[in-house]
Amino acid sequence: MSFHISLLMQQGQAAINAKNFAEAVAFFAQAAKESPKDPQIQACLGQSYCWQGLRAQGLKYLRVSGQLLLKRAKKNRDTRLALDLADQLQYWGDYSGSLDVCKQAVQINPEYVRGYQLLALSHSRLNQKKSALVAGRKALSLAPGSAMLAILLATLEIADGLHEDARKRLEKVLTHPAITPEEKFRAHKELARVLDKLKDFQQVFTHLHAAGEIAPRIPEVAKQDAALVPALLATYQAEFTADLLGRWAQATFPNQQPAPVFLLGFMRTGTTLTQEVLGAHPRVFVADETDLVASVVKELNRISKFQGSVPEQLRQLDFAGVLYLRDFYWQRAKALFGDKMAGRLFLDKTTMNSIDLGVINCLFPDAKLVFLLRDARDVCLSCIMQTMIPTPSTVHLLTWQGTAQFYAQVMTWWLTVKPKLSMEFIEFKYENAVFDFEVAFKPVFSLMGLEWDPAVADFHKNAAGKYIASPSFSQVAQPLYSSSVGRWKHYQADFVEIMPILQPFLDVYSYE
């Protein structure tokens, strides 16, 4: 590496450290122009684009870096850097790109366990269950004492219906002498899931409660601010008035881009199923679990010089500021998705943007909203059964009481803000979609201004083989099933302690 290129790389890294990603892109792009076959430069350029929000461009360079690293690995059989790159592709949601790198890496060095681990994860997230299972078994055969790989293989076995195999494997993992808190937590969670599938309902909550007791010892959980979201919801309930929410309801907005449709709800209410059905319409483009609204809130904070609460900042905003933030949203969307979204109705499905409903309504009063509902008992059961990435929201779903309380906080916010909304919305019950598909979905398409297309009933065919950023990724790659309705009835004794919290919402939405 020449002195000049080395200097460009140092300047690029300094820009990253300062979070000036546009400047970092400029430095790394110049370095790449001078040394186009250097995988490190290509990777740095790709990462910088991704951090800047230009994911489509970033992934292009990350993929190039992966191929250059594989070319080097063929000479020395050292696939570690190539697999680090595959891991980065997974981080940015490019499981197809990661799969390509992993397939080549395990051919170059078939004895390196991490290659098969990442290969299994790539296949799994793309709903390629049999291939994931083969890779998971190979990984564990190379490191038979690994509790982490045993848990991974058990999750793949559960996905493929090998429930008894998974149960035995997980029970064995829990006897492992050197098991870490995170591994123990995961094993209890997965064992609860497989026992549920085996209809051994009496043992399920024993493992869910055990996982909840272990969770605070996991570093990623411990560092989350559990008070953040409840405090935010309390502020929003008090400060988002009907006047504020309707402030720009009669405004005329530029019509270069139709207003988005927002698909929201609580976790595990069927938002992923609904996005796949709506996204099966040829005129709909789905943005799946993005940071678009979160980025707009950050930008609002920045231009408001971080003074006051979000509702107070919106009160101080003039119409030019509203137009700026709308444009900021669309520019970021275009950076993420490029030309793929052109000419199509933009469906923003980021489930917990429910928290930011006030911001959404203020800035996009011309948007449409689909809010998902589901029996609160099935919601809470499904939430506590899932293993989710720790965030200030998901840390509430680690215990039974915490799950019910957080559900109540979010739904109280919805019931408070709903009568004040100026945007058009529809409440959509998951159960209606399961039992009367066409009758349930036709009003949603009507709200979106779209004709009914019978082809949307085959949504699961589109979902198979693609990456879906939700714990439900495997469930929506199959036809609708009714077994997810009324699951709570298997656990009626466990619901006694949280029913006082849930009953008001069951009453409001007429769930018996």
Where are these regions (language model features)?
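Conserved phosphate-donor/acceptor-positioning beta-strand/loop module used by diverse small-molecule
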Residues: 360-384
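PAPS-dependent sulfotransferases, especially Golgi type II membrane carbohydrate sulfotransferases
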Residues: 135, 164-178, 187-257, 312-313, ...
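Phosphate-binding active sites in nucleotide-utilizing proteins
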Residues: 254-364, 372
